Amino acid sequence: MANRLKEKYLNEVVPALTEQFNYSSVMAVPKVDKIVLNMGVGEAVSNAKSLEKAAEELALISGQKPLITKAKKSIAGFRLREGVAIGAKVTLRGERMYEFLDKLVSVSLPRVRDFHGVPTKSFDGRGNYTLGVKEQLIFPEINFDDVDKTRGLDIVIVTTANTDEESRALLTGLGMPFAK
């Protein structure tokens, strides 16, 4: 069974975008390429347990094992040495990517307090969208009682669109609630 967001993309979004931007081929229509979830855990320098907990939560949210990221260079001001584990990231593609995006749009974002839509200024000029989440509690997989500390995470939605306008039309079609 195909994911409902993928079906919506194929049946509704592709024809709408083809009409709006006059694409000559269905293959020219932009699509979501991958979603990268990143959780930077600065306190992992002094407390290794916090990184384990963050990675565990990221695995619950994404449904796949996160990659532990390490510091590229030493920064004395942050008491950071090169090669020390300071974060975790997950790259979602295919079915898991559509499942996560569907869950993000329909369940998680509406749970954000005082939510008026995601900002429209977070496109990078190449058709990719970046979204910061202040707390991991908005995701239904995270049990409120098991959380030791609220942590934020970055969500990067990478699309094959060439412009921000095309990317915004794609994400709007997929149900992303942009602020008016």
UniProtKB/Swiss-Prot annotation:
One of its GO terms (molecular function) is tRNA binding. The keyword Repeat does not apply. Coiled coil: none annotated. It comes from the Bacteria. This is one of the proteins that bind and probably mediate the attachment of the 5S RNA into the large ribosomal subunit, where it forms part of the central protuberance. In the 70S ribosome it contacts protein S13 of the 30S subunit (bridge B1b), connecting the 2 subunits; this bridge is implicated in subunit movement. Contacts the P site tRNA; the 5S rRNA and some of its associated proteins might help stabilize positioning of ribosome-bound tRNAs. Belongs to the universal ribosomal protein uL5 family. Part of the 50S ribosomal subunit; part of the 5S rRNA/L5/L18/L25 subcomplex. Contacts the 5S rRNA and the P site tRNA. Forms a bridge to the 30S subunit in the 70S ribosome. This is Large ribosomal subunit protein uL5.
